[in-house]
């Protein structure tokens, strides 16, 4: 390093000199060699001639303020003697540096800087750090301060600081800026490089960008894309310089030094040429320039001036390209210009010729410029090209190029004046020929367009599309609309040559013109409508104001009246305010025919526009609504009209386009049939029954009156029917109506029961002709025909109906019982009658709910017939009804005098319905009706009502399932006597099984249920009772044979099963098991347990379970009436115990459940649920549960079918020991497995339970199989009441003792339970809560 200058300590001048030098030094990289000292350190300058080194002495002459003052000490006097405290303050965060730094490379000797640094021991928190640049700076400042104590020293210091800052920023930003400029220029030289020239989005048509002189800039600076012709002005160097100067001057506060630097830089730039700056300015222009309208003189001058720089840049760029090995033709805008040049052959030969010349007179001048490897050639070519550019008419050139560019074309009318000219000139070379066979008028208009296009060649695009030209184009478009798309496309391609835009743009313009014309057509109608509205509005506004005034006056009067209660009054006002948002009358526009007609005319025209739209992005409705919102609605004062009202008022015009096919429920098909059937049967017995049907569903008294008036053949049957009907009508029926809980849509549970009864009657009529069924019809009140009927109808429509079969199978007094819900004859005792009425009512109500139509018109005789059939079926399938059947041997064998008899009759009725295809349909209809009542449940799906109404159809439906079940039925020859029995046996080996099956699949195999109906109805209790009916009412079974031929009954049980499935929640399955094997149950309270296990198998296995029961059923049937009778007594017990038994799954009721699930393949899911429920011992619980919680499915049992089976099991044992509990019998045989009748409720509890009645709720001790009380989801209270009632009814002496403590159980149900208790003394079912 050169000998550092020595600092004179004494004289100030040297210091200043040094200071100045130092300033320079600072500019230079630090050259001073700092010498760190552990003690106060000093950097001693190399001894200068006149310098006296301070020889390591800490104290130095104060004057020797060598710059080494510790950075901290910015004091004027150097604190050398005592090194300043840690230089930390001065230290900028640079890494700790022991003040020693490598000396920068030696430079012209400058004064040495002596630094005194105090090194302190580092601590955990801090350590000494030094920044060499800062130390130098600080030292220099201190030196200045020390040496110059005059006030001017501050100025010097400030100036130095400013200068340092300026230099710092220059170093930081200046260089990069220059580099950036260069890079940008290079990037912009070949804008298109690397892009796909075929991409229509890339606009390479404006190649002149690269050739725009650097001296030109846009008028206001900046970039413009597709904005039409650009205005250029000469870029002034001074402006640029001034701008840069300003930038540089802003940071520094001392302009002098800055100016010097800047001036030097400027000179440099100027020497190098303003190439960088100008190209840079050119670049902005290039990005957005579309056309040049600048002065030619300026262009020429600049071109000449910048030719060298441009050529050099091109050369450099070419080298870079070669290095990248990209030989693709440069996509420099120049090339597009060349291509566009050929376009204007006529417009400007100058352009056409100039461009090739511009490119160095070579065939493809652009390529040589960039591709040529010879730098000298490149340079000359570029220079020549630039010179030629000076002679170009850039306006024309750019216009021509913009014509060819897709972007400029899409730019549409904004732009390039000469575009049309060049386009028209260029295209003719490749003008596609017009398609052949064009209309003469169209060809003439196209010729007119050609001529007009030539006139506008020199005008440019904006002037091209004049009104006349638009008219020609529109005329052509209108004619083309009548031609095919191929011809249209050919014409458009031809026209493209004559218009300053491409084909796509032309098509868009033509469509727009067409739509505009359509819009013009709207003006007049709109104006007329506006005028009409303005004429009408004043009057309406006046009325509105009057109304507002009247309201405000009324309000004021009220406020005054309430003045004494100011607070209350104010509160009231506040309360009123929200509702008073209207603050007065609503602004409701009153339409008149004139305005409506005007609106319709307007909409018609608008629809015409819509149809003209080629691509209908909107639907007609949205299109019209948006039009009304934006165009029509504003014609009214604000707030007086809404687009939806306009749409509504004009619907007559646009309805064909905007009306969506309404989705209407098509449910009523079956329902009407049911009604017809009922009507047909009604003629036989038309009296209060019909009235009842018509009467509100919930009219409890109607059924009784109907029965009274309609009591016809089979007095006992009729009576029982009446009682049942009345009971069903009574609140009990409603209470039991599961509809109320589950089926929200169905509002009249009683009516549902009535409908079921009616359906049963219809079935009976179909089987036997009019009979007591009419009475049953009477009890069945017609439920509200609203949703229920529709649902029923839909369900019915789904089911195959076989009315003829129902009609064929004769049913005696039982039909009425069946309708009422009892298959057995009218109970001999008034008590029995009442019970029977209750049970039948329940059943009727349950079934009626779904089959509203069919039940109401059925004649009493038909009902009786249906009852007889079902009682027969019951007798054969389940002997639950035997006891009451015996009591009522012939006509009312199934209709139990007591609730037990009623249960038995219900079962019998159910059985009949299931057995007899007609009865089955009818009965299923009731069940379905019940289900439909609880439409929520799958049961409703079966649509009992349709079945009832169309007994024949129902029969068919049941037949189908029946046939399916018949195979099972075949296994049990006993059932063979009755077609339904075979079904039952298919469903279950024995009638009892059939009953269970019904419980499980009431709908699927109604015939099964028909003869097992009692068990089905009163799941396990009925099983117990079933044996009784098997003994006594088996004669009914004999009638059932006629039914048995009717597989439709079985099919009907399928329907029932479906319904049950629907109302899976219902524990109806519990009932099914009981009725399933009346004989078996009677014989075996315990053997019901075995059955129950069978039932316990899968619900699908119900058939197999029922198989044993079915076999028993044959025996029951064989035993005939006596069995039925005996079964009846146990039936009740079975009902009670079936709940528990079901849980055990021991009763034959299980088989019943099995048939239910099996029989109800349609409702297999529901049946399965029932089966599970039965398994859990939900038989009785099922019965109870519907009462307490119609919506709740049996918790214990997975499905109502299971419940039924469990009940059946319990019922089987009960049947053996107790009088039949037929409460659930027919009524319980709900088409829906979910709706499976409560095993204990029997006829009393309608099978129409939207939910499964958990048998678990009812805990009944069964004689054979201890009733397993499954935990019932239903309310415990209901369960208790039901169990108590069931137990009492099952017990022989407690006919009346069994009073349901809970309202959910209708009185008639309670009575039925009591009757069952009387008849059945062996009921040993302890009541179990859930």
UniProtKB/Swiss-Prot annotation:
Pfam families: HUN, UBN_AB
Domain of life: Eukaryota
Residue positions where Phosphoserine is found in the record: 13, 236, 297, 402, 405, 408, 570, 1107
Composition bias type Polar residues, residue spans: 767-780, 809-818, 899-909, 969-980, 1073-1148, 1158-1169, 1308-1317
Modified residues (N6-acetyllysine): 1052, 1132
GO biological process, one term: chromatin organization
Record keywords, A-Z: Acetylation, Isopeptide bond, Phosphoprotein, Ubl conjugation
Region described as Disordered: spans on this chain: 1-113, 236-304, 322-345, 559-583, 767-789, 801-835, 866-909, 964-991, 1021-1202, 1292-1330
Biased composition (Pro residues): 81-96, 1030-1044
GO-annotated cellular components: nucleus
Residues where Phosphothreonine is found: 229, 238
Compositional bias annotation for Basic and acidic residues: 16-31, 55-67, 560-570, 1321-1330
Covalent link Glycyl lysine isopeptide (Lys-Gly) (interchain with G-Cter in SUMO2), residues: 258
Amino acid composition bias (Low complexity), ranges on this chain: 866-895, 1045-1056
Keyword Acetylation: yes
Family, as annotated: Belongs to the ubinuclein family.
PANTHER family: CAPZ-INTERACTING PROTEIN AND RELATED PROTEINS, UBINUCLEIN-2
Protein name as catalogued: Ubinuclein-2
């Amino acid at each position: 390093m050169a000998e550092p200058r020595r600092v004179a300590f004494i004289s100030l001048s040297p210091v200043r000199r040094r200071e100045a030098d130092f300033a320079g030094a600072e500019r230079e990289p630090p050259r001073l060699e700092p010498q760190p000292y552990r003690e106060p350190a000093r950097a001693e300058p190399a001894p200068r001639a006149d310098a006296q080194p301070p020889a390591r002495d800490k104290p130095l002459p104060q004057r020797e303020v060598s710059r080494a003052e510790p950075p901290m000490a910015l004091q004027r006097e150097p604190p050398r003697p005592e090194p300043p405290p840690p230089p930390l303050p001065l230290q900028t965060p640079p890494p700790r540096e022991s003040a020693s730094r490598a000396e920068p490379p030696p430079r012209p000797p400058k004064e040495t800087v002596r630094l005194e640094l105090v090194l302190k021991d580092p601590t955990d928190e801090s350590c000494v750090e030094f920044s060499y640049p800062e130390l130098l700076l600080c030292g220099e400042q201190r030196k200045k301060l020390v040496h110059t104590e005059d006030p001017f020293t501050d100025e010097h210091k400030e100036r130095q600081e400013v200068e340092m800052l300026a230099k710092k920023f220059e170093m930081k930003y200046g260089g990069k800026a220059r580099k950036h400029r260069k890079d940008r220029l290079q990037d912009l030289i070949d804008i298109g490089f690397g892009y796909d020239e075929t991409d229509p989005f890339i606009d390479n048509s404006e190649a002149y960008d690269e050739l725009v002189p650097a001296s030109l800039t846009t008028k206001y600076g900046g970039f413009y894309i597709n904005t039409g012709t650009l205005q250029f002005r000469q870029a002034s160097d001074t402006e640029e310089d001034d701008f840069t100067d300003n930038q540089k001057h802003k940071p520094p506060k001392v302009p002098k030094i800055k100016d010097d630097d800047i001036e030097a830089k400027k000179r440099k730039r100027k020497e190098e040429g303003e190439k960088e700056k100008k190209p840079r300015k050119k670049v902005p222009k290039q990005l957005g320039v579309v056309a040049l309208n600048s002065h030619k003189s300026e262009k020429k001058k600049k071109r000449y001036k910048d030719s060298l720089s441009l050529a050099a840049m091109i050369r450099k760029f070419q080298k870079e390209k070669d290095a990248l090995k990209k030989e693709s033709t440069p996509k420099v805008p120049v090339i597009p210009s060349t291509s566009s040049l050929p376009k204007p052959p006529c417009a400007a030969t100058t352009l056409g010729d100039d461009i090739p010349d511009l490119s160095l007179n070579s065939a493809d001048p652009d390529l040589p410029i960039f591709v040529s490897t010879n730098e000298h050639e490149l340079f000359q070519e570029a220079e020549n090209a630039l010179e030629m550019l000076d002679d170009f008419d850039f306006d024309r050139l750019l216009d021509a190029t913009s014509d060819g560019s897709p972007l400029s074309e899409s730019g549409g009318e904004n732009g390039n004046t000469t575009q049309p000219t060049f386009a028209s000139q260029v295209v003719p070379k490749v003008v596609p020929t017009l398609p052949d066979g064009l209309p003469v008028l169209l060809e003439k208009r196209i010729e007119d367009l050609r001529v007009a296009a030539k006139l506008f060649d020199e005008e440019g695009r904006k002037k091209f599309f004049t009104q006349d030209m638009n008219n020609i184009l529109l005329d052509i478009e209108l004619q083309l609309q009548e031609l095919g798309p191929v011809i249209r496309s050919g014409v458009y391609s031809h026209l493209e040559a004559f218009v300053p835009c491409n084909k796509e743009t032309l098509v868009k313009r033509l469509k727009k013109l067409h739509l505009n014309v359509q819009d013009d057509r709207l003006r007049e109608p709109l104006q007329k409508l506006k005028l009409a509205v303005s004429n009408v509005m004043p009057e309406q506004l006046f009325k509105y104001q009057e109304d507002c005034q009247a309201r405000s006056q009324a309000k004021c009067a009220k406020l005054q009246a309430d003045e004494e209660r100011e607070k209350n009054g104010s509160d009231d006002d506040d309360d009123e305010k929200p509702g008073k948002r209207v603050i007065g009358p609503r602004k409701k526009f009153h339409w008149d025919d004139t305005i409506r007609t005007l609106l319709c005319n307007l909409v018609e025209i608008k629809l015409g526009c819509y149809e003209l739209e080629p691509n209908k992005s909107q639907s007609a409705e949205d299109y019209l609504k948006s039009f009304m919102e934006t165009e029509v609605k504003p014609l009214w004062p604000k707030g007086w009209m809404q687009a939806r009202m306009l749409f509504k008022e004009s619907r007559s015009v646009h309805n064909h386009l905007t009306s969506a096919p309404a989705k209407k429920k098509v449910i009523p098909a079956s329902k009407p049939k049911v009604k017809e059937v009922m009507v047909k049967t009604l003629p036989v017995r038309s009296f209060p029954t019909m009235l009842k049907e018509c009467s509100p569903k919930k009219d409890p008294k109607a059924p009784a009156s109907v029965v009274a008036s309609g009591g016809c053949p089979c007095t006992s049957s009729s009576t029982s029917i009446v009682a049942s009907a009345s009971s069903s009508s009574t609140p009990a029926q409603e209470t039991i109506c599961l509809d109320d809980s589950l089926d929200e849509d169905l509002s009249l549970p009683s009516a549902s029961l009535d409908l079921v009864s009616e359906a049963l009657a219809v079935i009976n009529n179909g089987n036997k002709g009019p009979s007591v069924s009419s009475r049953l019809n009477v009890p069945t009140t017609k439920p509200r025909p609203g949703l229920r009927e529709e649902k029923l109808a839909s369900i019915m429509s789904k089911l195959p109906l076989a009315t003829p079969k129902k009609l064929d199978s004769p049913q005696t007094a039982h039909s009425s019982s069946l309708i009422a819900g009892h298959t057995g004859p009218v109970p001999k005792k008034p008590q029995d009658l009442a019970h029977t009425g209750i049970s039948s009512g329940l059943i009727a109500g349950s079934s009626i709910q779904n089959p509203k139509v069919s039940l109401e018109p059925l004649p009493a005789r038909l009902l009786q017939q249906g009852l007889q059939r079902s009682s027969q079926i019951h007798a054969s399938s389940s002997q639950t009804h035997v006891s009451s059947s015996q009591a009522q041997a012939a006509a009312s064998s199934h209709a139990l005098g007591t609730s037990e008899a009623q249960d038995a009759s219900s079962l019998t009725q159910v059985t009949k319905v299931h057995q007899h295809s007609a009865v089955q349909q009818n009965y299923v209809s009731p069940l379905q009706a019940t289900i439909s009542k609880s439409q929520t449940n799958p049961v409703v799906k079966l649509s009992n009502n349709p079945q009832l109404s169309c007994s024949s159809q129902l029969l068919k439906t049941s037949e189908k399932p029946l046939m399916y079940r018949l195979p099972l039925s075949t296994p049990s020859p006993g059932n063979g006597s009755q077609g339904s029995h075979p079904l039952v046996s298919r469903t279950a080996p024995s009638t009892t099984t059939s009953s269970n099956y019904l419980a499980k699949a009431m709908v699927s195999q109604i015939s099964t249920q028909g003869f097992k109906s009692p068990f089905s109805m009163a799941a396990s209790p009925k099983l117990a009772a079933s044996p009784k009916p098997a003994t006594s009412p088996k004669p009914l079974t004999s009638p059932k044979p006629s039914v048995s031929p009717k597989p439709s009954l079985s099919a009907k049980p399928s329907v029932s099963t479906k319904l049950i499935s629907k109302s899976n929640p219902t524990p109806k399955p519990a009932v099914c098991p009981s009725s399933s094997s009346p004989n078996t149950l009677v014989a075996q309270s315990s053997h019901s347990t075995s059955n129950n296990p069978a039932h316990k198998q899968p619900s699908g296995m119900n058939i197999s379970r029922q198989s044993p029961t079915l076999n028993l059923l044959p025996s029951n049937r064989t035993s005939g009436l006596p069995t039925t009778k005996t079964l009846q007594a146990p039936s009740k017990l079975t009902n009670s115990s079936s709940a528990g038994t079901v849980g055990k799954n021991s009763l034959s009721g299980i088989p019943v459940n099995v048939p239910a699930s099996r029989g109800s393949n349609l409702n297999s899911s529901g049946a399965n649920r029932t089966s599970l429920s039965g398994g859990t011992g939900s038989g009785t619980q099922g019965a109870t549960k519907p009462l307490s919680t119609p919506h709740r499915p049996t918790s214990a049992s997975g499905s109502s079918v299971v419940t039924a089976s469990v009940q059946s099991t319990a019922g089987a044992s009960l049947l053996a020991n107790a009088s039949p509990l037929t409460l659930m019998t027919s009524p319980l045989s709900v088409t829906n497995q979910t709706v499976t009748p409560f095993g204990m409720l029997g006829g009393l509890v309608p099978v129409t339970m939207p939910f499964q009645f958990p048998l678990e709720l009812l805990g009944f001790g069964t004689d054979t199989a201890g009733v397993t009380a499954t935990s019932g989801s239903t309310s415990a209270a209901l369960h208790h009441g039901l169990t108590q009632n069931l137990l009492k009814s099952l017990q022989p002496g407690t006919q009346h003792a069994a009073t349901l403590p809970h309202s959910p159980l209708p009185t008639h149900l309670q009575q039925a339970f009591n009757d069952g208790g009387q008849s059945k003394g062996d009921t040993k079912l302890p009541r179990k809560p859930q």
